[in-house]
């Protein structure tokens, strides 16, 4: 029987996402979600966390509520899900960027059963009209992405994340899956306690990246060293982290990096919420 179940799950993976096999703990996590149990996932960036709730959402009755901290992340995931389906209503997000007409269309798709994944920022989830709407909906499970934002001990603490559990209680309880790529044991305990999922099944993946190495060098004429290093690796891409916006602008504005294609991303550009 288990062999048939394994085969069926892989068939669905291939059908919906085009993959022939799962990565790491993905299959075990998905089975736990499908069984209706609370799930805590600690998995490195690039490990395939999103699939751990996307595939179960497609296979279960109802709509999965996905809570994510940034509009850009939600939009990217919704766009990606729509490429896997002929129905654009398969995934939606609800936030302040939508006008009344767009919100009405999203809610209609959800009520008609077309939508399997509905994304919210925590600030949007807590709005009274959204809570009232979701009370009418059959929720398959709740997925809390970037769950470290819940913990005051975490580096990206978001106060609204700590309101998620009370709001879930208002909407209607369902299994939870919390996912993060960064959580110390202390942060993990805080997440599980705050979400009321202390008995959750825990899945931890290895963070070892054999293709990466760390090297520490004394600082001597840093700008010259950066230029030399870039030119030694011609045709390749890299990321330079700076401690200030000013330094990013200096490096990418032409005063330091000469004859090198460069672009800068400032911290504030990633801080787009709700």
What does each of the following model-derived ranges do?
Residues 1-2, 118:
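Intrinsically disordered, low-complexity N-terminal extensions of nucleic-acid-metabolism proteins
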Residues 7-16, 20, 24, 28-40, ...:
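Helicase motor core with emphasis on the C-terminal RecA-like subdomain
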Residues 72:
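Conserved Rossmann-like nucleotide-cofactor binding loop
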């Amino acid at each position: 029987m288990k062999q048939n179940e394994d085969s069926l799950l892989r068939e669905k993976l291939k059908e919906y996402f085009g993959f022939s096999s799962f990565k790491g703990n993905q299959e075990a996590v998905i089975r736990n979600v499908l069984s209706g149990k609370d799930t805590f996932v600690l998995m490195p960036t690039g490990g395939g966390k999103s699939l751990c709730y996307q595939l179960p959402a497609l296979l279960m009755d109802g709509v999965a509520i996905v809570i994510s901290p940034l509009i850009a992340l939600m939009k990217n995931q919704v766009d990606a899900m729509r490429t896997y389906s002929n129905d654009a209503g398969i995934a939606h997000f609800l936030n302040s960027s939508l006008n009344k007409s767009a919100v009405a269309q999203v809610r209609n798709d959800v009520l008609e059963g077309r939508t399997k994944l509905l994304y919210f920022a925590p600030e949007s989830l807590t709005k009274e009209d959204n809570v009232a709407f979701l009370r009418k909906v059959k929720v398959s499970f709740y997925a809390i992405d970037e769950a470290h934002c819940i913990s005051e001990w975490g580096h990206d603490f978001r106060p609204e994340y700590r309101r998620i559990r009370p709001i879930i209680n208002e909407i209607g309880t369902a299994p939870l899956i919390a996912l993060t790529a960064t959580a110390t044991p202390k942060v993990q305990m805080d997440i599980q306690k705050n979400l009321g999922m202390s008995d959750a099944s825990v899945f931890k993946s290895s963070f070892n990246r054999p293709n990466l190495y760390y090297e520490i060098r004394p600082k001597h004429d840093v700008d010259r060293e950066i230029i030399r290093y870039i030119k030694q690796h011609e045709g390749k891409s890299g990321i330079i982290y700076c401690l200030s916006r000013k330094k990013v602008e200096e490096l990418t504005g032409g005063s330091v990096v000469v004859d090198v294609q460069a672009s800068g991303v400032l911290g504030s550009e990633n801080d787009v919420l709700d």
